[in-house]
């Protein structure tokens, strides 16, 4: 049985991991050249032990304790999932989905990725709400077997020197990274007058702040698959 997951984020990866345990053939499609980049998520990992999939690097680039770089987690997980047989369709957009019967979808794919044209899948999983790619033409997912639905709002993250952390008060998350920098994250249209900000990350994140945590999102993906029946 072939499964297409559209929207490459940690919810998709959790879903893919669970489906792999049941022997399914998994494809993950999205716009990016490398899934996880550019980063639009906080570097928060509160319960690493809850994730059954390895994602560590020998150099520990991804982080330490509860401060783990989201983009490195995605990179490490991509490698592990590929080893397990997941096929990644980078630079790919879903043009159309036609439901032929209850167990078969005909999907047209386009882009500069590995697959183009019309392909058949038994299950379509829409996890695009776990991603934020405003520059890309949206996937046209008129039909899907499973949809990850979450309420989101604007959010903003500041990457700054650790010495400037006291300038960013009332942050939902303030993270001290392994590289010596810090991240401060806020909901809504937050503004700062600090001129020493290194990077500003504008994104859309869940209203439920617990879903900003990488481990929570991976677990949500696993549950999305287990609850499908």
Show which residues each predicted segment covers:
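N-terminal Rossmann-like FAD-binding beta1-loop-alpha1 element of flavoenzymes
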Residues: 1-27, 210, 214-229
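A generic structural signal for short
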Residues: 4, 65-66, 137
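An acidic- and aromatic-residue-enriched active-site/binding cleft used to recognize and process polar
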Residues: 8, 31-34, 93
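Short, solvent-exposed loop/turn segments at secondary-structure junctions
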Residues: 11, 34, 130-131
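N-terminal FAD cofactor-binding segment of flavoenzymes
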Residues: 14-63, 70-72
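Class I S-adenosyl-L-methionine
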Residues: 17-20, 78, 82
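Short beta-strand to alpha-helix junction loop
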Residues: 60-80, 209-212
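Predominantly flavin-linked oxidoreductase catalytic cores and closely associated redox partners
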Residues: 83-199, 203-228
């Amino acid at each position: 049985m072939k499964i297409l997951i559209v929207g490459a984020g940690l919810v998709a990866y959790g879903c893919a991991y669970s489906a792999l345990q049941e022997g399914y053939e998994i494809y993950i499609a999205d716009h990016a050249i490398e899934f996880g980049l550019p980063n639009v998520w906080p570097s928060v990992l509160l319960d690493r032990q809850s994730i059954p999939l390895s994602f560590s690097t020998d150099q520990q680039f991804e982080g330490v304790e509860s401060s783990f770089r989201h983009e490195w987690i995605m990179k490490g997980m991509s490698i592990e999932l590929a080893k397990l047989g997941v096929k990644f369709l980078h630079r790919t957009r879903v043009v159309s989905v036609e439901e032929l019967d209850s167990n078969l979808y005909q999907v047209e794919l386009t882009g500069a990725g590995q697959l183009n044209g019309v392909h058949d899948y038994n299950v379509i999983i829409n996890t695009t709400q776990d991603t934020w790619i405003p520059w890309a033409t949206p996937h046209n997912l008129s039909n899907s077997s499973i949809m990850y639905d979450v309420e989101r709002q604007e959010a903003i993250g500041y990457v700054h020197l650790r010495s400037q952390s006291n300038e960013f008060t009332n942050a939902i998350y303030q993270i001290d990274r392994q590289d010596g920098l810090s991240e401060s994250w806020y909901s809504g249209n937050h503004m700062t007058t600090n001129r020493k900000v290194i990077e500003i990350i504008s994104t859309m994140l869940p209203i439920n702040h617990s879903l900003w945590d990488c481990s929570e999102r991976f677990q949500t993906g696993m549950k999305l698959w287990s609850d499908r029946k």
